[in-house]
C-alpha cells in the first residue's frame, strides 16, 4: 500500500508536541488497517474521509482519501491531507484542495 502525507498534514505533525505526534501515528495506523473508519464527506469534499479523535479533551480531525483495486478490493493507496483541531478545519481543507487542483 502506498501512503502519502500531503504538505499540510506533514507540517502540522512536525510542529506538534511529541505526545500528539504519537497519537496521530496511532490514528494513521488504525486508518491504514481500516480506511473506512472515517466518515465519508459529500458535496465539495466528495471522496474525502474524515476521522475524529480526542486528545487532551480536544477534538482533532484527520482528512484522507484512499483508492481500491476494483477486482480484489485491496487498498492500493491512502493520501493523508490534513490533521488539526475542528476550528476552521473544513474551510482550510477546501482551500488546500482548490489550490492543488489548479
Indicate residue ranges for each PLM-predicted region.
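A general secondary-structure junction signal
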Residues: 7, 43-46, 82
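Arg/Lys-rich, positively charged N-terminal/basic patches that mediate binding to nucleic acids
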Residues: 1-27
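Enriched for short, Lys/Arg-rich terminal
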Residues: 55-61, 65-102
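Residue-level detector of beta-strand structural context in well-folded domains
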Residues: 1, 49-51, 62
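Residues that form generic nucleotide/phosphate-binding pockets
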Residues: 12, 27-30, 92, 96-99
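A short, surface-exposed loop/turn module that caps and links secondary-structure elements
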Residues: 29-56
Amino acid at each position: 500500500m502506498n501512503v502519502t502525507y500531503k504538505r499540510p498534514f506533514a507540517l502540522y505533525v512536525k510542529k506538534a508536541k511529541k505526545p500528539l505526534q504519537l497519537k496521530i501515528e496511532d490514528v494513521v495506523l488504525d486508518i491504514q488497517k481500516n480506511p473506512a473508519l472515517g466518515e465519508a464527506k459529500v458535496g465539495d469534499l466528495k471522496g474525502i474521509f474524515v476521522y475524529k479523535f480526542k486528545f487532551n479533551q480536544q477534538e482533532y480531525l484527520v482528512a484522507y482519501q484512499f483508492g481500491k483495486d476494483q477486482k480484489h478490493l485491496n487498498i492500493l493507496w491512502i493520501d493523508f491531507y490534513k490533521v488539526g483541531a475542528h476550528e476552521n478545519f473544513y474551510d482550510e481543507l477546501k482551500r488546500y484542495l482548490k489550490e492543488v487542483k489548479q
